[in-house]
Structures are given as C-alpha cells and as structure tokens.
UniProtKB/Swiss-Prot annotation:
Belongs to the ZC3H12 family. Its cofactor is Mg(2+). The keyword Metal-binding applies. May function as RNase and regulate the levels of target RNA species. A zinc finger (C3H1-type) spans 355-380. InterPro entries: Rege-1_UBA-like, Regnase_1/ZC3H12_C, RNase_Zc3h12_NYN, ZC3H12/N4BP1_RNase_Reg, Znf_CCCH. CDD domains: PIN_Zc3h12-like. Residues 70-80 have a biased composition (Basic residues). This is Probable ribonuclease ZC3H12B. The lineage of its organism: Eukaryota, Metazoa, Chordata, Craniata, Vertebrata. GO terms for molecular function: mRNA binding; RNA endonuclease activity; zinc ion binding.
Amino acid sequence: MTATAEVETPKMEKSASKEEKQQPKQDSTEQGNADSEEWMSSESDPEQISLKSSDNSKSCQPRDGQLKKKEMHSKPHRQLCRSPCLDRPSFSQSSILQDGKLDLEKEYQAKMEFALKLGYAEEQIQSVLNKLGPESLINDVLAELVRLGNKGDSEGQINLSLLVPRGPSSREIASPELSLEDEIDNSDNLRPVVIDGSNVAMSHGNKEEFSCRGIQLAVDWFLDKGHKDITVFVPAWRKEQSRPDAPITDQDILRKLEKEKILVFTPSRRVQGRRVVCYDDRFIVKLAFDSDGIIVSNDNYRDLQVEKPEWKKFIEERLLMYSFVNDKFMPPDDPLGRHGPSLENFLRKRPIVPEHKKQPCPYGKKCTYGHKCKYYHPERANQPQRSVADELRISAKLSTVKTMSEGTLAKCGTGMSSAKGEITSEVKRVAPKRQSDPSIRSVAMEPEEWLSIARKPEASSVPSLVTALSVPTIPPPKSHAVGALNTRSASSPVPGSSHFPHQKASLEHMASMQYPPILVTNSHGTPISYAEQYPKFESMGDHGYYSMLGDFSKLNINSMHNREYYMAEVDRGVYARNPNLCSDSRVSHTRNDNYSSYNNVYLAVADTHPEGNLKLHRSASQNRLQPFPHGYHEALTRVQSYGPEDSKQGPHKQSVPHLALHAQHPSTGTRSSCPADYPMPPNIHPGATPQPGRALVMTRMDSISDSRLYESNPVRQRRPPLCREQHASWDPLPCTTDSYGYHSYPLSNSLMQPCYEPVMVRSVPEKMEQLWRNPWVGMCNDSREHMIPEHQYQTYKNLCNIFPSNIVLAVMEKNPHTADAQQLAALIVAKLRAAR
C-alpha cells in the first residue's frame, strides 16, 4: 500500500508542475484579450468578464490555489471598470431614476383610481397591487380583484364587505338570502292558512275519491314557505271506513295531521240512523275572517257571501285557488289577477319584494309595447293606461264639446199645429252668440212696442233677407236704415201661386251676373255673406229664423188643382184687401229684426185689437198716398188665413177715400180654407177687381200660417210657420240701378209648374230707398200697362205701335233686363219669323 502511494505522489506532483507552467501562458493571453476588450468597450458588462473567467476556469479546471490567484487578478479589474459608475454617479443618471419613480407612482395612482371607480375597496386594491407589483397590467389587477371577490362570496365571509363598500353589489348579492331567511324566521308576517280539506282532497282525487294525500301535499307546501299557523278542516265522518259511494284513500294521513294539531274535524253525528253534518265551509270562512288569514280552496262560497257583506269582501280578497299537477301543489303567482299582488305578498301581512311587482322595463323609454307592457315604466306613472286610439277619441270628443260650448248656441223654435193645436218640437239651429240679441224675444207684444223698436237705428244686428221682387214700401218720416223684406213674406213658389213671366229670364240672367248664393244686409245696408254670418241648418225640418229654403216635400199639393180654382175664389170676393197695408208694411219692413217682415206683414186684415186699429189708421192718415207717374203697381205682401172667430169682429175702421183707392188693387189671399163669410169692405165690389190672370195671387198651403203671427192674440189659430213651406224668392234683383221698381206681370201658363229648386236672393241696395219713398197708387184698368216696369213702359208703347202687342209683351217678359228698343225689335222680328 505504501509503495503505491509513494508512486502516486510523484506523479501528481509532476502533473501539477506541468499545469503551473501552462498557467502563466494562459494568464498572459487572457490579460491581453481583456485589455483589448476594455479599449473596445469600457462599459462592457461585468457579467461577460465573469462568464469568460468561468469558462476559462472550467476549461482549465484550476485547483483552489489557482482559483485564488485568478480572483486576485479579476477583482482589481472590476473595481477599475465600474468605479466611475457605482461609486460616483453622474447627475443625469440620478434624474433618470427619479423620473422612473414618478412614473411608477403615477401608474399606481391611476390603477388605484380606476379600481375605485369600479367599486372596489381601497384596501383590496392596495393588497392586489402589492401582490402583483405596481408594474403589473391593469387586466391582471382586475382579474385578481374579481377572483378575490368571488372567493369571498363562495366562502360566505361577511367580513369581506370591506372589499366592496361602494355600490349595491355586495348588498344585492347577500340581501335576497338574508331577507328570505329573515322572513322565514319572522313567522309573524305570514298570514294564517285555512285549508278546505274536503275541496283539496277531492281535487287531488280527480273528483272521484277523497285523496288525503292532496291535503298532505298542500300542508307541506305551506310548511316549506315558513307558515306555522296552518289549519285544515275536514268533516268528521271522513274518519269512517271507505265505502263504494264515498271512497277514501290514505286515511292515516288524517290521523297524523290531527296529532300534529293541523287538521280539525268538523262535528257530525247520527240521529236516528241519519247523519247530521255541520256546514264545514262556515267554519273555514269564519276562522279565516277572524284570524285575518287566507282560504285555500277552489270553492267561491257564494252562499256564504250572501250571509254577511264583510264575508263577501273577505272571500273576494283572501281566496287562494290552486291546481294539482300530478302530485305537485301549485297555487297561482297572481292570486287576485294580473294587476293584483304577487303570491309572496298575498301570503304576508306586510308586503315584501315590491320590485317584483314593479320591475322596471328593460327597454326603458325605447319600449314599443305601450300600455300593454307588463313591466313598470316610471316615466308613465301619471299617464293613463289607454291606447293611442282611445286617447284620440277622447281628445276629439273634448275638442268638439269645447267648440260647441264656446262658439255656438242652439236655438230652438216651436210651432203649433193648425187644426189640433199640437206642439211640435223644433230642430236646433246653431247660431253664434245670440243670447243678447233683442230679436230673440217673444213676438207677443203690442204694436206700440215693435213700433218703438222699429224706429231705433241700431235695434238689432240681425239682417232680414230681401225678396227679388223688391216691393217698395213707405219709409217713416225719420231717416234711418231701411230694412229689407223677408223673402218668406214675399213669394211662394208653390203649385197654384203665380210665377211672373219675366222670372225665368231673370233666373237665366242671374247666372251671368255671378251673384253670391245668398246675400244679406247689415243695419247700414252693406251687403255681407249670409253663409258667413249664419251657419247652415242641421236639418231640413228646422223652423229656424234665418232659413231661406223650405222642405218642399212637406207641401200638400193634392188639394191644389189649378190656378182657375184660386182665380174663381178671387173673383167671388172671398178674400179682402187691407186698406192700411201700406202703413202696416212700412212699419214692419223698417225693422232690422229677424221677426220684422216675418210677423207683421199681413194681407187682407190687420190686428183686430182696437188700439192696433187706431194706430194703423193714424199711420195711414199721416202718409197720404200719391200716384206713381204710371200708377200701376201692385202690393206684394204676405197672406194670412184666419179662423171663423176673426170674421165676427167685422171690418176695420177705414176712411172712404182709402177704401176707394185700394179697391183698384187686385185681391190677394190665402187658400180656400179661409172662411167665405169674412166680410169685405162695403164699397168694394167683385167687379172692381181686375181679371184673375192679371192678379198676383199668393197662397198658403193647407191654411198653414206662422204661429208667431198669433202670439199676441190667444184666440187666433196657431199654425206652423211658413218658413218650411216656401222656397226663397223667385229671382234676384235687376242689375241696373234704375230698374228696382217692378210691376206685377200677368200669369203665364208656362210658369205654373212648381219650383223645387232653391232660388238665390240679393239684399236691398241703398238706392232703393228713393223708390220706396214714393207712395203706392191704385191700378188702372189697362190690363197690359201694369205689367211693364216704369223705365220700360215708353219703350213698350212705342214697340206696340209697330208690332203686335202680345208679341211685344212676350218678348219683354222673356227679356226683362233688355232696355234697348233696337235689341227688343230684333228679338220681336226673329220671333215673328220663327212663328211663320
């Protein structure tokens, strides 16, 4: 052993000496390389030098002594290289370090603020940032925060509320469980439950058997909800053994529930072999009412609702119905309907979880379901839950009512039946704001009253309508606005009444004149639109004050055969002429009242009152009649029919000159229903009347007169008004300014057909006042001259000297507005040639 050791030692020494010899050479080469590297890069990393040295050491595998020597050589080199950087830092490097620290602080604060905005606690955020470091990404921080939050919720640590102090998230997560536990524990808030055992058992047994298992299922459902006060009523006879007519299953459940003091048997007994059963429903309702609980049953207890009113209301509000789905007891979530409380609130004395009832709509204001949306809309809290169509209907009704109440007034007139005296209701006529109109007063007034009203220039703003015939009247001595004649008092285009021969041509000429449909005048004679001032009628059956059109279909034309029938009556002197007509009509027409020419223009008789006769006689004597230059004018006025009682009062007091003067006028009367014994003036003879064909006869249909004409005297007959029997005037006024005074023309067979079309009228021009100031005169016996207007009479006479008078008259009747004699002559020649 020793020999081998000795042999080994010299070998080792020799090898060591060889390594020592090689080491200086390697060191010198390494130093040269190191010096060159230092010159190349004075700031090279020390790690590279250490790596090189380590590589060299590994390759050479130095011993411990050799490693020490190597370290001695490397240490001073490191100090020389790194001494300027580490021991003596420059100013630029220190500023860079300070800027880096500031950037880290800013990032830290930014992440802290961002996490705080999300609702996380400051302590939690700090712990996460300290764990991950300030240089961590924001996504990593958020992920760690979320992980910590979920971990705290899963572990159920309540102390983690420090992590989420802001926002309702932590409270919302923990509140449902806690609130439900509190409610379950708080049994005082749950209502007592009274179960109709018979109803529940039979429902579970599908109406075929009494299934006690259904009662157990219902009880278990309420026990799971936390109810402790549960009572089940079952008749006592259900404890008996099952019979084929009354099968019972699982009777042991009844005994079990009875021991638990949940089930109660209602009394029943046998009397002489018969079972006497107490009414268990009364027990159920009474206990539930007294304990302020709920009733679990599908029975409505209609018989008990009648017994007590309080029970009726209680049953309606506290009855909980149910269903069995196989072996599952299922009450409805809305026991009282869609708009009633939820099941949770229904089972409790104090409602909870109101957010379930008023859950906000997820669409918010963008919801398009409207009033049908089952979710809660806070912006619609005060709005009615109606559809858009219902809202439009209601708004339309309100606007209509408002318009009617503000801008219109319904005016109604009443007419009396002529024979039976029956009162007929008038159709409403709309007129704007007529309450203060003095014309809407009763017409039952004395002549003195309406005479005083007639002399007021501004008595009324209601204009009267003007007839196309433009009958001149005598104005009063005082100057005031001249009222217009009422159309209904001037014309009657009914079968049997006369159309002038010139009317057809007048109607044709009217189209070229472009007259407005209906014109009226105000108190100063200015024409204004009738349609604008007064709206149209709502019904053709209306007896309104301003109507110009009549419902001609109401006329009874069966009793009117031909014009000879009426002419014969005129020849027999059936009708008399009122001598004081001029003064009467003068007073009437000067009124602007809408009743003026409608009430007071009479033909054949005036008021029978003595004072009225005296007044009319006085007014007639004050205005002496002077003849026209050609004096062939006929008065065109209203007609009137009287009953037999009027005929007994005798004729009016009149002077003989007046009677003689007016005796030359043709008679104008009403229908043949007027009594034939009506007296005529003594000095008027039938022969004094002209031919029937020359007379302007105005008739009234079926002896119907205006009821307003008789209101001053209750003895007179009351008849419906004339306004629905007659149409408007026959034709408009002539267009020339000097042709307003028309004379009556003879009757023409071609114009005897009834006129069913409404005719237009015009208002009275102011220039007509001058013509109306001329009094009337009697008629001449010349049958042709009284047909021609004054301004055409000379032309007519000249043409008659050349052509046949009948042809001249026919042409002038056909062309009443043609005043040129040459044009008329050309027309006459053309007619003569056509006749050949």
